[in-house]
């Protein structure tokens, strides 16, 4: 029987899984692109889609529901002030999962999960330095 097979357990307890996806969702909202393992990325996608749908609603109840799922208020603020209006016209499909090879240490399949129509300037400091160096080489 296929009872209780609705999601990946990822060898973690319920509390650990909930914290993991709250942290990953916050990182994705902050940086708009993260690299993780393929099963985690596939499991994170519906969580983020639901958060963006809440942000599109934009009312107080939706904000409190999002705050219950995310760990930091700055992620909730960014979700409702930047990402919600950005995807107001799009009916779903806010993130994409791209396969990114295999991790060196254990050959785990890796993936990049990113927002569609993302802001390339929202990346972290290391990525900004790398992209600046690439642009300097091109000129």
Swiss-Prot record:
Keywords: Ribonucleoprotein, Ribosomal protein. This is Large ribosomal subunit protein bL17. The gene is rplQ. GO terms for molecular function: structural constituent of ribosome. InterPro entries: Ribosomal_bL17 (IPR000456), Ribosomal_bL17_CS (IPR047859), Ribosomal_bL17_sf (IPR036373). Belongs to the bacterial ribosomal protein bL17 family. The keyword Ribonucleoprotein applies. One of its GO terms (cellular component) is cytosolic large ribosomal subunit. The keyword Zinc does not apply. One of its GO terms (biological process) is translation. PROSITE patterns: RIBOSOMAL_L17. Part of the 50S ribosomal subunit. Contacts protein L32.
